[in-house]
Structures are given as C-alpha cells and as structure tokens.
C-alpha cells in the first residue's frame, strides 16, 4: 500500500475527478448560507442542494469537493469509538444530470485500486448494493470484475428521506482483517454493512434516479444525479495503517502536543486517558474551524454547540492533569495540519485563540468548584435507591457552574447513573419565568414580546452625545411585565432620550452606567437592543431601586464608544478601499464592529494577494492621515442614492436614512456611530484575510491602540528572530534565514548520501547469507533500519545485486513490525507470488499487507513475531515451488 499523507489523499481525490472533467469547488463555510434548515454544513451534498433542486444551474454539471463538515447529534460518542468525530471532511464527486452508474462505479474502483491513485488491495474491497439494483450489480461484477462473494445485497441500500429525489446506493467497504474485529468470525453481524469493526465503510455512492411522490409512489426522475461521499479520515486511517481515525496525521500531532501540556500523560497508556486525548483533538478541530467561519460561543444555536465543545474539552483536560486554559494553545497545531487546503485557521489564528481562551477562562473560574460539586452529587446519587441525579442538582451545575446538561449526563452515564431530565427542564422553565428578559424574545427568530409591542412611548437616540445625559425613565419591564419600580437583579429600561447606541448594522451596543440625581450608581447597562416600536431597550443590572418617571443621568462608557466609532468608520474606509483595489464588483457581505477589532466580509471569488492586501491597508491609512471630516446627513433614500450612497444588499430602509460621507472616497447608508474626523482612527492594520464560503472573503483588522499593539508585538517577534539567526539588522533576517536553509539542505543531502552508503554496506552484509531452498536461492534476514523507506531501499539494492531469487527482509521500526518480500523472474516462474507470501506471513506479526507478484510489503503490531514469520515464508517457498 502507498504511504500517503492526509493532504496527499485529499489532493489526489480532487485531481482524479478533475482529470475526469469535474469542476473543483472550494469547501463552503461551515455556517450554511441561505439554508435555515441546517445548523451546520454536515456533508458534501448539503452544499449541492441548490444545484440538485434546480434553483441554481452550475457552470459545470460535474463537481468535486472536499467539504469540511460538523455533525453534533452524537457528541457523547466522540472519543469512545474509533470513528465518531464532530468535525470531519467529506470527499465527494457529484453529477447534476450528467453521468450515472456506468461512469461513476468504474471511476470509484479506479481511484481506489489503481497504482496511480490510492492503490488499495482489490481483494480487501467489498461493496453493498440494493437487491433490485441489477444495473449497479452488473457494473460491479461484470464491468469492474468484483467477485460475487465481495458483493452484498442489502435492503438498506436505498436512500430515501420522504418526498422528493431518492434512489439506491452502493457502499464500499475495506476489510481490515478479523484481527481488527470486535465480533467473532461467525457472528451474524460479521459482514460488509453489518455492525462490526472489521469491514470499514469508506465510500457511499447514491444513485438519485427516482422521485418519491406524496402518494407514496416512485417515478423515474427525468435527470438522474450522482451524490457520493468518502470520509477523508476513514480512508486515511486505512492508508496509514491506523487502528482508528485518531492515529492518523490528522489527529496525532494534536494529541502529541496535548501530551506536552498534560501532567506526564501519554497516549495509548490507558483507555480512560485515550478517551480524553481523542475528545480534545476532535473538539479543537471543530471549534477552530467554526470560529474561523464566523461562529462564536453563546447560549443558543451554533454558539451553544461551541460552548459545549470547548467546555467538554476543558473537562477532559482536567482529567489529564492540565491546569487552566489550554485548548487555545492547540489551535496552531490544527492550522499547521490543515493549511495546505484550509488556510483560514492559520490566517485567523490569533482571533480564534482569543475567542477560545476567553471562553476557557470564563469556564475555569467555576470549573474546579463545579467538579467538586459534581463528584459529591454523583456520590450521593450512587447511595440512592433509584441511582438518579435530581433535576435540581443538574440544573445547579448548569446555572451556577456553567456545566451544559449534556456534560453532566455523560458523567452520570460513566458512573452508571441516570438524570431526572424532566426535573431539569422544570427548573429551567422556572428560572425563565423568574428572570426571562425581553432581550431573549427579541433575539429569537421572528418573535417579539407582547409587553414590548404594546409600549408606544417615544424614545430618542442622540448620536453626538458622549457626556452625561439627563433623561426621564418612562418604562420599566421586569419579568415581561410593565412595573413602576425595579428593585431586583435585572430590568429593561426605556428613557425619553438616550445616548446609548442599540446594537444594529453589525455594531455592538454601548455599555455604561446610570446614576441618580445624587450621583449614586443605580444600574449598569450591559446591552442595548431595539424594541419592536424602535425604542432603545437598556438591559441593566440593578444596583439601587429605579422608579418610573424619575430623572437619571446616563453615562456611556467612553472608551468602549471611542473604539466602536473608530472601528465603524474604519469599516467604511476598508469597504471603499477594497472596491478601489479589487473592483466595484466587491460588496459588503457582513460586518462586526467591536471596540477592539473589526470584521468585514466581502464578495470575492478569489483570495486577495499579499500585494492587494498591502494596497488596501495603505489606502485606508492614507485616508486616515489625510484628516478627512466625516459628514452625516439625514435624508430620504432616493436623495441618499443620488448622493452616491451604497445601499447594502438585504437591508431594508425606511422613509428616513442617515448617509455617512468621507469626502468623495466613501458614501454609505449607515445608522452607526462614527468619528468626526478620520485622523481619530490613528491607523489600521489588517490581521487576516480568509475565506468564509464560496465567493465570500473575510478581513479582520484592528485600529488605534490595538493596531499599535499588533505592530509592536510583531516587531518584538522580529527582534527575537533577528537575535536567533544572528542577523546584524532586521533587513538581513530574510537573507540570513535563506542562508541557513541552504546550509540545512546541503547537510540533509550529505546525510542522505551517507545513509545510502550505510544502507549499501548493510546490504553487502545481509546479502552474503544465502540459503538454498530447493531450486531457489533465498536471502532472509532481520535488518536494523530506521524506517520502512530504508527497508525498501535495501530491496532496491537487492534487485541490482542479482544475489538471490527471493528476498525476505523484516525490521522492527518504532515498536512496529515491517516486512518486504521481493522475487526475481525465476521465483515467479517457479509459482511463487510475493503478495501471497506476505499474506501468509503478516498475521504472525499482527498485521496485514499485499502487493504485486514480484514485490509486497506488510506492517503489523507485534515485532516479536517476525522471526516466526520469516520461517513461515521459507516454508512456503519450499512448498509452493512447481
């Protein structure tokens, strides 16, 4: 079998189908675009829906992709099984009304078995087909040449989700050998498609040829489609001879780095620790890519999934003796593994690490206390008659210590306990009834609180006010009820006028304080949202009693507001600069304005070059340093458009709009807060540029003090590098590194030449011990080598030496067994086949292998069996000669 990296396998798949006329489609964002039915992109075909339903016609009806995907329906199994993951890649080839079975089945076989491609052993491949799908059976048996006993007919091989397109499918399985099975050889489930660990599904080909009608009938589709999916992690585990997906190069670097962070723990030392290592490796991949694509931890939807994954990883870090926040330290490892095809984690590394670290630090505050409480709760539940954790206890862990219910559920399962889920739900409902905020209703999909809808009082937002503002409190909402006084924990307030900006248009809300007439702090403003009737809703933590009708002093957090103003004006400059550098086809596709950074999404079919990024950054800073006044005009939409204002796609504008102008460089409709002059921004620095999805790019940038910090941090890094490479000045660093690289390459070349000489010398020693086995001469020995490549090189030396007819070389490498068998023409004519010999020997050292008649190789887990395996080969050589 070929030795391939995961990156090589991925690229090989795309190259194969590109050769067969397919358009290679970039992986879409994990966050579905225009598909509210999906929380995450969970398969390759999920991104093809628009093509298969006919809403969009593809440029090429043959498409291939490697699609990053997230599935979270069985998070609790991750780490406990060989194949479960939350984040995975799905390799796929798709036909939108183009080719069908007679093309796709031979292609699949060619890719899997051809030496040019994966080169898997055909004898180890099995397929399943739908019993009535005689066409697929014919293609596999009569065209591909698969034996009957390698084709299994299963009723389950029909893809149907109700009304709509459907059809039979064919799954391809790889036989990992009975030694890797978890059921007995005579078990009824021991077959391809059964519940067993021996036959690993690697590819599913769906033949979408019918339409399932509402009346239950199936009719032929006029245009037949192909949808296939191959799990990258699964096929890589086969190629890299890994027991599970986690021992591949997609996970092991993360696991090795986690070992360094742990309290002396080592992977493969015990089962419990292995589960923790696997959970951490999987979850950091998922959260890194999800954050890169725009998801952030929160208490709902995708954000809740991220929060759960991060906290589950942190809990397992504790089990490995890791103290404090650590998951963010693994992000660079994820980026390095995946950068060849997915550069976004490397591009957004600092931001991803910041998000994860902040989330970890929030959880770490209560983690230790929460774990102690959990241990006590479990101990008490074990003493109870019903062995059940009460809903009240589970809710306390959730509400006070931030333990998602699912984590407590997993801990209970591991301890052999149950949880009173009904009791937990009742506690959750009671809490919502006690302290539910109107904000929760506003932020849910399309729902608006009845109480807020009935508030008609006018409230005016004053843009320019940053100093203290006196205002009358006209409405108080507590627990979804209008009240005259607030003396509790939380409240929602409406004033007759306010300087607090409510979140809108990508700009987050102002924070600040509310004082009484005596200058005493009565409330902290933690968020501001728009009410149904457009008043600004101030969500506050109540410090002292608040009364309706009283005058209060409203103080905006000026530092936060300044950061928001600077970054919002900077997004306008950035938008204009992108359109000037990339072209006017570039449009804003989304934005986020925070006090300490900005995120700007824009339409673009291609990544920006380094030169383009530098040009955009330079242009923005030139406009900042030109000290241009920022002018705002309130007018009607038509007048605004005549002024040249850009209207954002998908935005709805009322009768009155606000136009923000920066000379003739930028004119946009915008309701956000802005600088009075561009020079207040100071400077802008682009931190990263990456893909969000097909046709959308994302820039993350910082301004002012954050930009200065970003530059100085990198200057410090450059100085460290300068010192490390002993460069006289910073300008010499690149040349110095190039010189070091040249020296390193020269040293590596010398080392390789020396190694070749050593191997040649070893070959001379090994090849002098020649045995006569009937009519054939045999060299059979265990070699002292560093790797499988050295073993193969010795075999190559043997070919040119003409020392014997048969070569059997074995070696122990890194605790694993390896064997190579080579035959000359005389041995082959005598009836021997290297592949047959290796298959006989491999089980003795706990492995498997295969190859061609003249050369074969195998690997295994038990080096102690190599001596007996060599003896077995010699016996076979004697018995199998004609």
UniProtKB/Swiss-Prot annotation:
Keywords: Aminoacyl-tRNA synthetase, ATP-binding, Cytoplasm, Ligase, Metal-binding, Nucleotide-binding, Protein biosynthesis, RNA-binding, tRNA-binding, Zinc. One of its GO terms (cellular component) is cytosol. This is Alanine--tRNA ligase. It is found in: Cytoplasm. SMART domains: tRNA_SAD. Disulfide bonds: none annotated. NCBIfam families: alaS. One of its GO terms (molecular function) is ATP binding. Zn(2+) binds at residues 568, 572, 670, 674. PROSITE patterns: AA_TRNA_LIGASE_II_ALA. Signal peptide: none annotated. Catalyzes the attachment of alanine to tRNA(Ala) in a two-step reaction: alanine is first activated by ATP to form Ala-AMP and then transferred to the acceptor end of tRNA(Ala). Also edits incorrectly charged Ser-tRNA(Ala) and Gly-tRNA(Ala) via its editing domain. Belongs to the class-II aminoacyl-tRNA synthetase family. Consists of three domains; the N-terminal catalytic domain, the editing domain and the C-terminal C-Ala domain. The editing domain removes incorrectly charged amino acids, while the C-Ala domain, along with tRNA(Ala), serves as a bridge to cooperatively bring together the editing and aminoacylation centers thus stimulating deacylation of misacylated tRNAs. The gene is alaS. It is an enzyme of class 6 (ligase). Its cofactor is Zn(2+). Its EC number is 6.1.1.7. It catalyses: tRNA(Ala) + L-alanine + ATP = L-alanyl-tRNA(Ala) + AMP + diphosphate.
